[in-house]
Amino acid sequence: RNAATVSDNLTNGGRKKLNISNFIGYVPADENENFSWSMEGYINDYGIAQMAKKLADQTNDATKKANYMSEYYYYLNRAKNYSLLFDDSGQDVTSKWLRGRKTDGSLNLGNSDNNTGFNPFWWGADYTETNAFNMAVSVPQDGIGLANLYGGRDQLADKLDTIFTTDGGYIGYGG
């Protein structure tokens, strides 16, 4: 479980805020680009889970198999923590987003140019070199789970249509 171990030196990689995210399921908003750190971590966790499953399938040693399967389930469950970042408070899919959260679980509202409200066009803040539009469907490890969050396959298709048909007007450091 080294991917769940807090590192003192992130110069050559690692994960930010593991001392907190291991317990609350995401990197909190007091860390710049927190949302992206969280989402990348979930994808990494899914990869680690798949590796553990493969190792379990290849060994005949019962103890090793049990340990690998324990790792598999641990990381597979962590990979699904993206659901903690889903904001379903909108009336329809056009106003539902994957967003950054604060340590207390409340949504981060300070990603706009005046830091007073959520703006899905805002490039940066919670997001690394992107915005809420680009990250709204960035869950390659669990497409069915993502569709369920939006309300089903048709609603996920509607969200994709919204992303593809909304005019860019991005703002922030990448806009």
Question: Language-model segments: what does each one mean?
Answer:
Residues 1-80, 86-175:
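Active-site core of glycosidic bond-cleaving carbohydrate-active enzymes
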